[in-house]
């Protein structure tokens, strides 16, 4: 498992209060992990801070699964 994936998983567990086993690449933030719109905003902010990147709103709307987040962050950091 990549270091970035581990860091992303840890952020998701911390922000959403879910078990690490639930955080799979296929997991949807809303449907599988129970995130609401505020959770998603806070999660994007956590990703931006942790990886020192900027995620524009139009890109954030496309990040729907853990795998989406990993791919986006790996491309930009």
Curated annotation (Swiss-Prot):
Pathway: Lipid metabolism; fatty acid biosynthesis. Pfam families: PP-binding. Keywords: Cytoplasm, Fatty acid biosynthesis, Fatty acid metabolism, Lipid biosynthesis, Lipid metabolism, Phosphopantetheine, Phosphoprotein. The modification O-(pantetheine 4'-phosphoryl)serine is found at residue 37. GO terms for biological process: lipid A biosynthetic process. 4'-phosphopantetheine is transferred from CoA to a specific serine of apo-ACP by AcpS. This modification is essential for activity because fatty acids are bound in thioester linkage to the sulfhydryl of the prosthetic group. Residues 2-77 form the Carrier domain. GO terms for molecular function: acyl binding; acyl carrier activity; phosphopantetheine binding. PANTHER family: ACYL CARRIER PROTEIN (PTHR20863), CARRIER DOMAIN-CONTAINING PROTEIN (PTHR20863:SF76). Carrier of the growing fatty acid chain in fatty acid biosynthesis. HAMAP family: Acyl_carrier. Belongs to the acyl carrier protein (ACP) family. NCBIfam families: acyl_carrier (TIGR00517), PRK00982.1-2 (NF002148), PRK00982.1-3 (NF002149), PRK00982.1-4 (NF002150), PRK00982.1-5 (NF002151). This is Acyl carrier protein. The lineage of its organism: Bacteria, Bacillati, Bacillota, Clostridia, Thermoanaerobacterales. The gene is acpP.
């Amino acid at each position: 498992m990549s270091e970035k994936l581990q860091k992303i998983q840890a952020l998701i567990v911390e922000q959403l209060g879910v078990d690490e086993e639930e955080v799979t690449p296929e997991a949807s933030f809303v449907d599988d992990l129970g995130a609401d719109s505020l959770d998603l905003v806070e999660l994007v902010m956590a990703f931006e801070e942790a990886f020192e990147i900027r995620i524009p709103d139009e890109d954030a709307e496309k990040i729907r699964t853990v795998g989406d987040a990993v791919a986006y962050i790996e491309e930009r950091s």
